Each structure stands twice: as structure tokens, then as C-alpha cells.
Amino acid sequence: MGPRVRVGVIVGVHGVRGAVRIKSFTEDPADIGFYSPVENEAGSIKYRLKVTGEVKGLVIATLDGIGDRDAAEALKGTELWVARERLPRLAEDEFLYSDLIGLVAEGVDGKRLGIVKAVADYGAGDVLDIKLEPKGDMMVPFTQASVPEVDIAGGRLVVVPPVYAPDENEEKSGGA
């Protein structure tokens, strides 16, 4: 089995006939239906899914063989995966979150800062969560200005660290 990509996770049930609520990780949430059948994380079970609607940012779908609420409830937390080759080809400046996680984050001076541990979208755009070395974390907007270079093959990206304004509640150094 080649590389796979997580495209969603079942987060709950919808109604009494076995429909599920899915948090989709596809660009357009309803597009998860185009990748049917999807697999569980182990790759041991395939699910044919049919998108029937969307509610509050979640996809409502039916799965073949799941016909009641109890069966759907048992799937809560199941991650849905597809083979990477089934995804559309990306533009040169597009990346999957899974491609970014684990990359070495370097400063513009080439100094190693840490490792990308997560990518999140809080509504205002993608944000890289970088585990700094030797300790700490840094959140960086995933924009051309903040991340001017991404080298997937080389396993690295270049980060312009954000400049933080001092917290007005912080103690002033050098004071009495």
C-alpha cells in the first residue's frame, strides 16, 4: 500500500437511519464524496460514502452497510483515508498539510529553528505550529511573506519568524 492521506473523520451521527457527520479535510468539504470508497486508518475496512448535505461546516453522509443510529455511533472517531494518487495534482505553490508536517523549519539565515508539528486553519488562513529547538512553540502564518520557501523534497522550509509586541503585563527588565 502506497502513501495515504487523511481526508476526514467521523465526528457523530445524524438522525436515526445511520447517517454520519464528517469533519472533511478536503478544500471543499463536500468533495470528500468524490474519493469514495474511503478506508479506515488501518486500511482494513472500506466505506462507500454518499454526501447528502452539510450542516455547520460538517458533511452529512451515508455509508453502505450502515443503516441505523447504533451502527453509525460505533464509527465515531473513525478517520477516513484515501491513497495519495487519487488526489488531484497540486499546483507548484500548493501543499497538503501532511506534506508540511515534519519538515525542518529554518530561519532566513539557514539556522534550524525546529520542526513543523501541525498545520491549522482558524478561519483567517493556514497557520504552521512549529516545535522550536531546544524548547517552545511558534505559530507562523502560512503565507508567502512568512514562509518564502518550501522544499518538500529537501525536507525543509524557510520561516520569517513573527515579531511579537511585548505584553503590557510583562515585567520590565532592568527595573527596580
From Swiss-Prot:
GO BP annotations, alphabetical order: ribosomal small subunit biogenesis; rRNA processing
SUPFAM superfamilies reported in the protein's UniProt record: PRC-barrel domain, Translation proteins
InterPro entries membership: PRC_barrel-like_sf (IPR011033), PRC_RimM (IPR056792), RimM (IPR011961), RimM_N (IPR002676), RimM_N_sf (IPR036976), Transl_B-barrel_sf (IPR009000)
Start and end residues of each PRC barrel domain: 92-165
Pfam families attached to this UniProt entry: PRC_RimM, RimM
UniProt GO molecular function: ribosome binding
Keywords in alphabetical order: Chaperone, Cytoplasm, Ribosome biogenesis, rRNA processing
GO cellular component: cytoplasm; ribosome
UniProt KW Transferase keyword: no
Gene3D superfamilies linked: PRC-barrel domain, RimM
Predominant place of localization: cytoplasm
Superkingdom of origin organism: Bacteria
Compartments, as annotated in UniProt: Cytoplasm
Record has rRNA processing as a keyword: yes
Domain description: The PRC barrel domain binds ribosomal protein uS19.
Entry similarity comment: Belongs to the RimM family.
Self-association and partners: Binds ribosomal protein uS19.
Free-text function comment from the UniProt entry: An accessory protein needed during the final step in the assembly of 30S ribosomal subunit, possibly for assembly of the head region. Essential for efficient processing of 16S rRNA. May be needed both before and after RbfA during the maturation of 16S rRNA. It has affinity for free ribosomal 30S subunits but not for 70S ribosomes.
HAMAP family: Ribosome_mat_RimM (MF_00014)
Protein name: Ribosome maturation factor RimM
Organism: Paramagnetospirillum magneticum (strain ATCC 700264 / AMB-1)
Top-level taxonomy: Bacteria, Pseudomonadati, Pseudomonadota, Alphaproteobacteria, Rhodospirillales
